[in-house]
Swiss-Prot record:
InterPro entries: Flag_MotA_CS (IPR000540), MotA-like (IPR047055), MotA_ExbB_proton_chnl (IPR002898)
Topology, Cytoplasmic side: 202-253
Name of encoding gene: motA
Keyword Membrane part of the UniProt annotation: yes
Entry protein name: Motility protein A
Organism expressing this protein natively: Cereibacter sphaeroides (Rhodobacter sphaeroides)
GO CC entries: plasma membrane
Transmembrane segments: 3-23, 29-49, 146-166, 181-201
UniProt entry keywords in alphabetical sequence: Cell inner membrane, Cell membrane, Chemotaxis, Flagellar rotation, Hydrogen ion transport, Ion transport, Membrane, Transmembrane, Transmembrane helix, Transport
Protein localization: Cell inner membrane
Entry membrane topology: Multi-pass membrane protein
Lineage: Bacteria, Pseudomonadati, Pseudomonadota, Alphaproteobacteria, Rhodobacterales
C-alpha cells in the first residue's frame, strides 16, 4: 500500500473539514443540490467525453494509487544476470520455464527461447510498452477530465444560484444565505479537482513512468542475452537505471 498517498489524501480532507468545523460547523458547507450539480454533472460530462470502457475502467485505475504495482529494479537485474550466466553456459534453451518476476518479463523470455531474433524481440516488447502507455493515458485522460470539468461545473452551479438569488431580491435578509449557497458549488468543484483528482492523476502518471522504465530495463537485459553479452556487461548497462544510492549499495554487495 502507498502510505504516502493515503496519508496525503486523508490529511488534506481532514484539514479542510477541520477548518470548517473550527469556523462554526460543517452544516453551512453542505448543500445537496450543489453537490449533485458538481459531482453528478461532472460524471455525466466525463461519460460523454470518454468511451464507456474507459469511463468504467478509470475508477479501478484510481484505486491503484493506494495499492500500486511494485517494480524491484535490483531484483530484475539480479535475475537477468543469473539468466545470462545460464544462457552462456548451457544455451538459450536452458532458460525455458525459468521463474521471472512478472508477465512482461516472462513473455520476453519466451520470445527469446523461441528463437526470436533481437530486432523482432525488441520490436514486439516495445509495442507492448506502447500499448500499455496508451491504456494508461486513456485512464489518466478520464481523471484529468474531472480536474478540468469539476471547477467549470462549480461555476455553472454558482451562476445558477446567482440567477435564482437575483430573481428574488424582495427580501434583503435572504441575499447573504443565498449567495453562500451559490458559492458552494465553486468550492465543491475546486476541492474535487485539487484535493482529490489532481493528486491521484499525479500518482498515476508517476506509476506509469516507473513501469515504462522497468519494462525498458527488461528489454535491455534480454537484448544483451540475445547478443550473447557477458553477465557483467549486462549488469553494468542495467545498473545505470538505478539511483546513485542503489548503485553504490549494489556495488558494495
Amino acid at each position: 500500500m502507498d502510505i504516502a498517498a493515503a496519508i496525503g489524501l486523508i490529511g488534506a480532507i481532514v484539514m479542510v473539514v477541520g477548518s470548517m468545523i473550527y469556523a462554526g460547523g460543517v452544516a453551512p458547507f453542505v448543500d445537496i443540490p450543489s453537490l449533485v450539480i458538481v459531482v453528478a454533472g461532472t460524471a455525466f460530462i466525463v461519460l460523454a467525453m470518454k468511451p464507456l470502457p474507459v469511463f468504467l475502467g478509470h475508477f479501478k485505475a484510481m484505486m491503484k494509487v493506494f495499492k500500486p504495482s511494485r517494480f524491484d529494479m535490483n531484483e530484475v537485474i539480479s535475475t537477468m544476470v543469473e539468466l545470462s550466466n545460464l544462457a552462456r553456459k548451457d544455451g538459450i534453451m536452458a532458460l525455458e520455464g525459468k521463474a521471472v518476476p512478472d508477465a512482461f518479463f516472462e513473455k520476453g523470455l519466451q520470445l527469446l527461447v523461441d528463437g526470436t531474433d533481437e530486432a523482432k524481440l525488441v520490436k514486439q516488447l516495445k509495442y507492448e510498452i506502447k500499448a500499455m502507455k496508451a491504456r494508461h493515458e486513456a485512464y489518466q485522460g478520464a481523471v484529468k477530465a474531472w480536474i478540468d470539468i469539476g471547477p467549470a461545473m462549480g461555476m455553472v452551479g454558482t451562476l445558477i444560484g446567482l440567477v435564482l438569488m437575483l430573481g428574488n431580491m424582495s427580501d434583503p435578509k435572504s441575499i447573504g444565505p443565498a449567495m453562500a449557497v451559490a458559492l458552494l458549488t465553486t468550492l465543491y468543484g475546486a476541492l474535487m479537482a485539487n484535493v482529490i483528482f489532481a493528486p491521484i492523476l499525479n500518482k498515476l502518471e508517476g506509476y506509469s513512468a516507473d513501469e515504462v522504465t522497468y519494462r525498458e530495463l527488461v528489454i535491455e537485459g534480454l537484448r544483451g542475452i540475445a547478443r550473447g553479452e557477458s553477465a557483467r556487461m549486462i549488469e553494468d548497462q542495467m545498473v545505470c537505471a538505478l539511483d546513485r544510492k542503489q548503485q553504490m549499495k549494489r556495488k558494495a554487495a
